[in-house]
Amino acid sequence: MPNFTGNTRPDPTLFEPAAFAKWIDTSEAPLLLLRSFLKEGIENLKQRFLTGTSAAELLPLHAWLVDQILVQACRLHTKKCPERVALVAVGGYGRGTLHPYSDIDILLLLTEETDSILQNSIGHFISFLWDTGLEMGHSVRTVAECQQAARDDLSFITSLMEARLLFGPELLFKNLQTAIAPEQIWNSRQFFLAKQAEQITRHHKYHDTAYNLEPNLKEGPGGLRDIQMIQWVSKRYFNTWSFDSLLQHDFLTVSERKELLESQSFLWQLRYGLHTLTGRREDRLLFDHQIALAKQLGYHDQGPHLAVEQLMKDYYRTAENTGRLNEMLLQLLEERILLVDAKVHVRPINERFQARNGFLEVINPSVFKHTPSALLEVFLLLQQHPEIKGVRASTIRLIREHRHLIDDNFRADSFNRALFMEIMRQSRGITRELRRMNKYGILGAYLPVFGKIVGQMQYDMFHAYTVDEHTLFLIHNLRRFALPKYAQELPLCSEIFQRISKPELLYLAGLFHDIAKGRGGDHSKLGAKDALRFCLYHGLSRDDSRLVAWLVAHHLLMSMTAQRRDINDPKVIQRFAREVGDERRLNHLYLLTAADIRATNPNLWNSWKDALLNKLYTATQQALRQGLEYPVDKKEHIRDIQNEARQALLKDGWTEQKLDILWSQIDADYFLRHTPNEIRWHIKALAQKEPHDGAPRILVRIHNQEPGTMEVFIYARAHALIFTVTTRTMAQLDLDVLDARIITTGHGFVLESFVVREAATIRAEADLEFRLQEIQEVLTQRLTQPDRAPPYRPGFIPRKLKLFKFPTTITFTKDRRNQCTVMELTTNNWPGLLSRVCRALASCQVRLVNAKITTLGTQVVDVFFICNQQDKPLTPEQQQQLKEAIYTYLER
């Protein structure tokens, strides 16, 4: 007699199995009845979830619901051959848990080869299931066929290990279990090695980090697969994957079991919610769904903490902890399975630690209990002994179990404070060990303010990493400046670093620079207070402590100045130099700034930003060495640039007379805003016959060898729409404007200088000449008759741009020295943005003098130096009119 042995928990609130079977037997339309029960049951479970029932409660109920449908359908279609086929749930469904749109995989296990009766029964059964609305994967095999397929396929043996009998002969199912046992195929050693390699490949696919901005809840590092990995390997070795049973095997501790169950429940909750939200199988936590999922799961904005940021922080912390447990437990299993017969080589390190086969371990399990400072010492030893490959899993477990010993008394101990500073002063392994300290929870325990930023993300497209990961990446970048093998990466940074007498001060500034993120208020000022307190508490001199605090307080100063101010202006340099104060601060700030930008987003750093910072550093260094009481005279600065450019041009064959004529036609500010090298290049256009025919003179060249970045110089008759048409054309050419400088001459001409970058794919070197020619020709055509240039039609808007919308803000300040208005615009980085702004400027008869374009992911912060038709700063009325015009054009 066939048996129903599905072991998921029955739920009489969905329906009662015996009565359900009776209804099926007496129904004239069992298909309609099953379809109706399935639909109603799924809706019932969905409503329970939306009203607060946990995913952990619903997953077995969902599996049980599907069990009933399958069992009744199988019973109906195998009446003629009940002893010859068993219905088996496999894979994730076999575990007895099912998400709303997860795969439903079944195996029809046969006693023998099929005949026509069995074949017809199976065919009708499968068709019937599809008609009920179930989407399944199925296979039909004998026990021998299952064994052979499993022998050759890691995924299939894993799927069969999770098999669960739903309906049919128990003996047949037991024969399958015997056939795939470790004694027959895939012993625990073979299985461990194969699954270990599989996990490494899977993690590589997700960049080996749990901190992806759009993580995969199932497959990503720290996801559900990492928990299942522990269970699969345990099943092959211990013949159980129950966390309770693994506790009895002394493989898991009570706290580890609790952590695994909590992580699993949280990840289940997210995945169940994601399936419910999207109405399909979706395991990727895309930006599209993060806000809605946070709301669905009951998160609310709390002060500076957005609901979505709280959700993602919980996810990252859970995933990171799951990853740590996965790594530690697999290492413990590796020692039991692979290294049980390995030759042991033990080398003493000191009275507390020894190296066993290349891994550091405690000599006595009570080391941390009796000597809590060893919780820091372990990381110092790893720095001092580079031959040691890592920490043994048993010692990692002890570290985790004794983290609670790092309390106020521990932090107040002068020996422990000295140990921490010794770690920061080492010549090697600083980044690696800080990351390991973070991984084991020691860094957050010793620095509670750091613990608060672990897993904290910012919901934008600018910050690619969580705050803690970004911080450690910044320190990694600082360390690269110290290493000769990376000297060619950023030569100036490497050169300056050699002059830093106490690198630990830089590392501390990096550690604290974002430590106050998420508290509300100015994180730079708040972090500076934390840094000063920490440094003084850890025995640093008052002078060194103040330097670290100053760096934290001003860590954005240099990048903001370089990217939003006209650093060709000596007055800007003078103001910046006064804020910095001395060359020691300048050196530290420059290194911190470069490392910070490079650690924020892999796409943020380029040679253009490198050149800007380099230029600001060099000019400020010169101002400081000259003395702040002797500022650079603007006229003298212009004369120096003219003379340097003149000498180069004379060597090129130009005459003094010709250069004097050219110089007289150009406003003095032109020489302030351009380098001698740029002037030398521009002369090619300026020396040509003046464009009275309406055709502009245009030059295009590659900029600083940066892939995809170019310089464009335009010499044309002044026209109200000239800048609007230029920026519109660049948008149509898929060029992003990084920098723009505009000079109007006294005889009715305009000089436009741009640094632009390919918005899309960087082109191959072979295509560059064609691309430069294309840009030149299209700009020439459009600017010859600006009035007839085609209107801009925005193209495809990327998905992420639509998701991250920021409020538009416009502020005006007066630059009295240069008699212009500085307008700062913060808004979304829509395609053609600059063209729209320029149309607004033209409509208000506002003249653009200079522009600094800064893109922060999907947000831009653009600074425009503007004046009215009288070359004066805008009046309050003109500012309001322009603001309204910009809002109007941005909304179109």
UniProtKB/Swiss-Prot annotation:
Pfam families: GlnD_UR_UTase (PF08335), HD (PF01966), NTP_transf_2 (PF01909)
Cofactor list: Mg(2+)
Stretch list, region Uridylyl-removing: 349-710
Activity regulation as described: Uridylyltransferase (UTase) activity is inhibited by glutamine, while glutamine activates uridylyl-removing (UR) activity.
Residues covered by the HD domain: 467-589
Keyword annotations of the record: Hydrolase, Magnesium, Multifunctional enzyme, Nucleotidyltransferase, Repeat, Transferase
EC number, UniProt record: 2.7.7.59, 3.1.4.-
Gene Ontology MF annotations: [protein-PII] uridylyltransferase activity; phosphoric diester hydrolase activity
Domain of life, per lineage: Bacteria
GO BP term (any one): regulation of nitrogen utilization
ACT domain residues: 711-786, 822-892
Chain spans, region Uridylyltransferase: 1-348
InterPro entries xrefs: ACT-like_dom_sf, ACT_dom, HD/PDEase_dom, HD_domain, NT_sf, PII_UdlTrfase/GS_AdlTrfase, Polymerase_NTP_transf_dom, UTase/UR
Catalytic reactions on record: [protein-PII]-L-tyrosine + UTP = [protein-PII]-uridylyl-L-tyrosine + diphosphate; [protein-PII]-uridylyl-L-tyrosine + H2O = [protein-PII]-L-tyrosine + UMP + H(+)
Domain text: Has four distinct domains: an N-terminal nucleotidyltransferase (NT) domain responsible for UTase activity, a central HD domain that encodes UR activity, and two C-terminal ACT domains that seem to have a role in glutamine sensing.
NCBIfam families for this protein: UTase_glnD
Protein function: Modifies, by uridylylation and deuridylylation, the PII regulatory proteins (GlnB and homologs), in response to the nitrogen status of the cell that GlnD senses through the glutamine level. Under low glutamine levels, catalyzes the conversion of the PII proteins and UTP to PII-UMP and PPi, while under higher glutamine levels, GlnD hydrolyzes PII-UMP to PII and UMP (deuridylylation). Thus, controls uridylylation state and activity of the PII proteins, and plays an important role in the regulation of nitrogen assimilation and metabolism.
Family: Belongs to the GlnD family.
Protein name as it appears in the record: Bifunctional uridylyltransferase/uridylyl-removing enzyme
